[in-house]
Curated annotation (Swiss-Prot):
Keywords: Antenna complex, Bacteriochlorophyll, Cell inner membrane, Cell membrane, Chlorophyll, Chromophore, Light-harvesting polypeptide, Magnesium, Membrane, Metal-binding, Transmembrane, Transmembrane helix. One of its GO terms (biological process) is photosynthesis, light reaction. One of its GO terms (cellular component) is plasma membrane. Residues 2-23 are cytoplasmic. The chain crosses the membrane at residues 24-46. It comes from the Bacteria. Antenna complexes are light-harvesting systems, which transfer the excitation energy to the reaction centers. Belongs to the antenna complex beta subunit family. It is a single-pass type II membrane protein. It comes from Rhodovulum sulfidophilum. Pfam families: LHC (PF00556). This is Light-harvesting protein B-800/850 beta chain. InterPro entries: Antenna_a/b, Antenna_beta_CS, Antenna_beta_dom_sf, LHB-1/5, Light-harvesting_complex. One of its GO terms (molecular function) is electron transporter, transferring electrons within the cyclic electron transport pathway of photosynthesis activity.
Length: 51
């Protein structure tokens, strides 16, 4: 088996592919965080004992 120097260990992705996956993961995390923040804000408003 020959080693491909363009691949990133241990995934086997190229550096460009790994960066693309990372960007999508970060974008998804930001969307999830924004939705969670909004949901917590609504829950705090709707909960009578929190004011």
């Amino acid at each position: 088996m020959t080693d491909d120097m363009d691949k990133v260990w241990p995934t086997g992705l190229t550096l460009a592919e790994a960066e693309e996956v990372h960007k999508q993961l970060i974008d998804g995390t930001r969307v999830f965080g924004a939705i969670a923040l909004f949901a917590h804000f609504l829950a705090a408003i709707a909960t009578p004992w929190l004011g």
